[in-house]
Amino acid sequence: VTNRDAKYEATVVAKSATVTYDGKEHSAIGVETYEFVVDGNTYTVTGLSTEDPTQKDAGTYTNNITGTPVVLDAEGHDVTAQFTVKTENGKLIINKAQVTLKSADLSKKYDGKALVNGKTALETETGFAKGEGATYTFTGSQTIVGSSANAFSYTLKANTKESNYTISKNEGTLTVTDRGTKYTVTIKANSATATYDGIEHSAIGVETYKFVLD
């Protein structure tokens, strides 16, 4: 039996995996197969190993194949000389998780007091891994008739890495509308009473321009 003029080809492919960040470890382990059937005969490639990356954080990690391939036939004979063995590294891809944050839309009739978010929770807060998240500070305020953003900022918790997330931040609207029944305000000019004494006397200004409502 002589060597083949044209060698058989075998490609060993390392396993790959693609997941979305969830705070847990993920792996890409081993290869798709070490066994190949050529012309009805089964062959096994030995001598190779994979790095088998295990990671938690978002990123791309290579599952490298290392070693020197040895090809054995079904009876265990070394037939490496009859083969060209190629390798393809795999990848562990952990994609960033998508987080959506949105403050609420709030409204009220004008009452002279600022409309703020207060203790109202975010309307939408989705995508954080279990045990991870953020704290929020609301700065939006609307007092007069009109509307403005229910503005807020966030600070990620100590155990939460920004690099593991793509965060979409949307602000709701604070709206103050006209009152159905208007307030009634009476402004009184100051009065004065005096007895004639040959001197000028005056009644100047108003009692007050300031009013407390509700």
List PLM regions with ranges.
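Solvent-exposed beta-strand/loop surfaces, strongest in extracytoplasmic domains of secreted
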Residues: 1-214
